[in-house]
Amino acid sequence: MNREEELYRIFKEELSKDSKIRYSIVDELFNSIKDKNQDLKRKYASEIHGLMTGNITLDIFILSFCVRIDIDVKYIKEMQEKVMLSDSLDWRQKYFIYQQIGSLIFLNPQLNEKDAVVGQWKLIEQIRDLCKTELTIELRQVSDEECNKNLVIVMTDQFITIQHGPTKTALDRCYVIKKKMHKNVFLINTADALPLVGEVPFFMIQVGNHIPEYIEKTEVEWKGEKFTYYQCDEGMPDIGEIEQVLLAIMKLKPSMIVAVGGTSILMALANEIVPTISIGLTQSGVVTTLTDYQVVDYNMLDYVKPIVEQSGRTMEHIIPGKFTFSLKPQTEFITRKDIGIPENAFVMAMVGARLDQEITDEFLTMLESVMNDRMMVVLIGVC
């Protein structure tokens, strides 16, 4: 029996005994399988899927392992269904799983199918409703007459450094609202992206970034403009902290809220007080947000329409726009000579955070068909 077979035997035995999962064994098993051919990976995933016990937390772990081996949306859909039907998982655990599934879909574009997106929408709706049962305050909608027309709240679920796309997107939106629209801006970091609160066994857990020192900040600056800043505690989602922010929103009565990303549970609840619009972080899809509105690129309207309608919404939820971004200020200068690229070469640069998934065999075949001796390819990002 080789090491791979031994690992698989141990894994099956532990699952059959409902034992505590030994992540070192699972990691080693995954590393021994991940580079196999697709047929063999699918065979392993199918066999491991058959080991499900009916224990919801173990079953979620098995499904999260299977989808990493065989990137098939059926595992995502089954996970969503099991979480929705579970009475033993509380809303924090469901939110943890919802966020992990969202990360899987983002990192693996082939999982971004209509049914999976609709499943995410239904799951966050259930999570919001369960969360509301624990609130000790009443969410009161601010009327148009009483709102402060000179104040806009911008919310983001992560705020770290300018190298971080969502952080820069949030600052860019704050800048435009203040500089171009002449509104005061209050920036809130909800700190509930990919949280560990509510953690259940899940293979290859992704964790949101957080800078604890920022909790002392009351103001941030971007391009010469200053914005009031508040950062939620690191232990989000927390009912006490959620209520504190919601009470502040009801007191401040902003004219609107701009939600960067839009999948935060706090953003979903804030929408019940003030009209909220989500701005997605990618051009290529729709955000499973509970805000009243979201901006979608004009080119994606035909794609998102059936998804939006299957989720029970109308296209009034969608505001057509143009996906925009700006490059961060350049702080480092690299020449062709520095990295060994000839001056007369034609260079194709591929930039991305998930190049390992996006550069497929089909893409490489296409690339090979157009390459010649005077061309070079440069990969910039995660690969």
Give the ranges of each region predicted by the language model.
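Short acidic, S/G/P-rich loop/turn micro-motifs used as interaction or catalytic elements
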Residues: Q158-Q163, A193-P195, E234-P237, T263-L266, ...
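Short N-terminal targeting/anchoring amphipathic segment
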Residues: L247-T263
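N-terminal subdomain of nucleotide-sugar transferases
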Residues: M1-G54, D59, C66, K82-V83, ...
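Conserved nucleotide-sugar phosphate-binding/catalytic loop shared by glycosyltransferases and other
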Residues: P201-D238
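Conserved catalytic-core segment of nucleotide-activated headgroup transferases in glycan assembly
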Residues: Q163-V176, G312-C383
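Active-site-proximal region of nucleotide-activated glycan assembly enzymes
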Residues: L107-G119, I273-Q330, E343-N344
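Short, Asp-centered acidic motifs that coordinate Mg2+ and/or phosphate
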Residues: S255-M256, Y293, V377
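Generic beta-sheet signal
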Residues: I188, V260, I279-T282, D297, ...
